């Protein structure tokens, strides 16, 4: 997403004066139908700018399940949830890099603390 960003780092746009649409919810409705729109969508990728409507990225959730998942993943080394810039700072940096044609991975990594940047994983998915 390279447009406006909410205080929580989600893409957004205005469709009328005073009427804001959260971009990932709009994309999800386009992909899955407005009738199938859940009250809450969870970002499995922990990237609030993500616009990918596939279940690997966005899925229906409850407030309780979304909060529990956030709490369990915020301590994962290298997680976007650990970015020292906060969700808005991280989203703004990534959006600006995308607008400027800059590689996104170094920009994403720049917000991680020393522990996150230097910690090797204990195991990989293939093990």
Language-model-derived ranges and their functions:
Residues 1-19, 48:
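Long, compositionally biased stretches
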Residues 18-127:
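Short, cationic Gly/His-enriched loop motifs
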């Amino acid at each position: 997403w390279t447009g406006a960003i909410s205080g929580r780092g989600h893409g957004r746009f205005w469709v009328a004066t005073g009427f804001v649409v959260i971009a990932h919810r709009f994309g999800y409705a386009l992909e899955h139908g407005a009738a199938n729109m859940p009250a809450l969508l969870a970002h499995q990728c922990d990237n609030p700018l993500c616009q990918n409507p596939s279940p690997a990225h966005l899925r229906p959730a409850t407030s309780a399940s979304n909060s529990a998942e956030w709490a369990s993943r915020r301590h994962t080394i290298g997680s976007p949830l650990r970015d020292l810039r906060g969700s808005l700072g991280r989203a703004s940096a990534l959006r600006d890099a995308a607008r400027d044609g800059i590689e996104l991975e170094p920009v994403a990594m720049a917000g991680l603390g020393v522990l996150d940047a230097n910690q090797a994983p204990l195991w990989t998915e293939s093990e």
